[in-house]
């Protein structure tokens, strides 16, 4: 049976660390930021770790070879 392909949308959105955690970028920074405070915009920088169950699902269904 051939290997499952990685979903290309998931490749762009998620990154798996060496310890197996799944990182993702914060949502809500594309548009409409005029109504947010500077503090809110600043706190949306960087990446966050997905919850373990969500990360397991992402690895199983979208990033099978990660």
Curated annotation (Swiss-Prot):
UniProt cross-references to HAMAP family, sorted A to Z: Ribosomal_bL35
Family, as annotated: Belongs to the bacterial ribosomal protein bL35 family.
Keyword Ribosomal protein in annotation: yes
Keywords of the record: Ribonucleoprotein, Ribosomal protein
GO molecular function: structural constituent of ribosome
GO biological process: translation
Keyword Transferase: no
GO cellular component, one term: cytosolic large ribosomal subunit
SUPFAM superfamilies recorded: L35p-like
Gene: rpmI
InterPro entries cross-referenced by the UniProt entry: Ribosomal_bL35 (IPR001706), Ribosomal_bL35-like (IPR021137), Ribosomal_bL35_CS (IPR018265), Ribosomal_bL35_sf (IPR037229)
The protein, known as: Large ribosomal subunit protein bL35
PANTHER family: 54S RIBOSOMAL PROTEIN BL35M, LARGE RIBOSOMAL SUBUNIT PROTEIN BL35M
Pfam families: Ribosomal_L35p
């Amino acid at each position: 049976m051939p290997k499952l392909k990685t979903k290309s949308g998931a490749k762009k959105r998620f990154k798996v660390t060496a310890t197996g955690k799944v990182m993702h970028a914060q949502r809500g920074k594309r548009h409409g930021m005029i109504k947010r405070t500077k503090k809110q915009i600043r706190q949306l920088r960087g990446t966050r770790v997905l919850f373990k169950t969500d990360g397991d699902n992402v690895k199983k269904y979208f990033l099978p070879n990660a």
